[in-house]
């Protein structure tokens, strides 16, 4: 963006963006291009709501700030805890009633994973204990390279997995059919943290960032699955030996990597490495196909809404010179194209995380973290394959306006259909008042929503400036910065000095108080004098308001 400046009271000059970067909140909104069905959601609390009146006030605040809906974990560990097919939906019915009363839409997440132990987890909700009595630990849980067993989600090698999910999904559908007016889509959980992945980076098993994590296929069930896959591919052990350069005598000698570090340094490049990693990912895609089929059969006849699943943004070690992509491979992400092919085949929307991050550590040891590059790659694949895709921030955003700008740039540049902010408590206090994070969230992301905002043109007359100074708008609502000049909207353009104009997307029907301010390249602010200006945004069409700068 180029700003116009006055020199010697006469001529207009153009300067680079540098002077305006401090106030980058509106950079992406001025000429934003966004998917026509774009919607903004906020994640509900992890913990149980105990005061639904206060919760309703929080949701009304979301509604008043342009948020379309709230996403909610429907914890398996809550509703079917007493025993198989013994469901208690009372809590979530009260929850859904509150969402409806606040005027929001609802996205239930069928959370068949455990909560606790992962980044951002503040509560502990295990998988129902009776589930683990259905079969052996070897058949039902993941086992990693070091011998650790993981119970964050039921292993895809358990043959009864889809039956368990079918019972859970079917009960939800029958109990919430009367809420289809607010349910706008449904998400299914494909693994830890609700993401389609292996539990490869579990802090409780010693993982620390930016470690590669651990492969999760060392149970007898997993090893047998790998052996059978190779038998199906090659037919004979002689064919395996020819392809791998080995001297095996029986398929029972085939195993996952016995030295993970060596494998991710060298072994992954071999035919064996390709075969192993292709199989390792195929376990996830097969699981996705199975649970998606169950979800469609349970939900489509009742709700007829999109079904989706999430892929984690495993962005570290992306450019590692010694083991590139090792963290992704451990999580099960070997070939994103074939991974997304299953989303397409299963008619699933896809959500991808880490939109708030940048590539500043892309070539910095030990991180080699390239989240922005990864987002672009996966989003381009989704666009090329015609897959509806949505975005999230991976970590809570606090006092970091650039993170919201990063999100907005991804959303507008890569045809995302929606964005979900992590999390309610970050932008709304328990009493329903907004936190300081609401303004940058609304300005950068909510105002991108087509048909959800009204273009209002502000004209500011007689606003004389000196070289390096621009004119902005700041006001009483979140989309005008909540009087915080850090989030002032602008800079305005100056087609006929000293008259300045700017068109802003504002929330329909809101009553605003505002002022013009002048901000120079050093961040110095000059406030307009006099009383606040007032304006009511139209509920449809466009709006305009003209003021004269008050000294």
Curated annotation (Swiss-Prot):
It catalyses: Hydrolysis of (1->4)-alpha-D-glucosidic linkages in polysaccharides so as to remove successive maltose units from the non-reducing ends of the chains. Substrate binds at residues 73, 113, 121, 310, 315, 353, 393-394, 423. Keywords: Carbohydrate metabolism, Glycosidase, Hydrolase, Metal-binding, Polysaccharide degradation, Signal. Optimum temperature is 75 degrees Celsius. Stable at 80 degrees Celsius. Residues 1-32 form the signal peptide. Ca(2+) binds at residues 80, 167. GO terms for biological process: polysaccharide catabolic process. Its EC number is 3.2.1.2. InterPro entries: CBM20, CBM20_beta_amylase, Glyco_hydro_14, Glyco_hydro_14_CS, Glyco_hydro_14A_bac, Glycoside_hydrolase_SF, Ig-like_fold. The keyword Signal applies. Residues 448-551 form the CBM20 domain. GO terms for molecular function: beta-amylase activity; metal ion binding; starch binding. The active site is at 195 (proton donor), 392 (proton acceptor). Monomer. This is Thermophilic beta-amylase. It comes from Thermoanaerobacterium thermosulfurigenes.
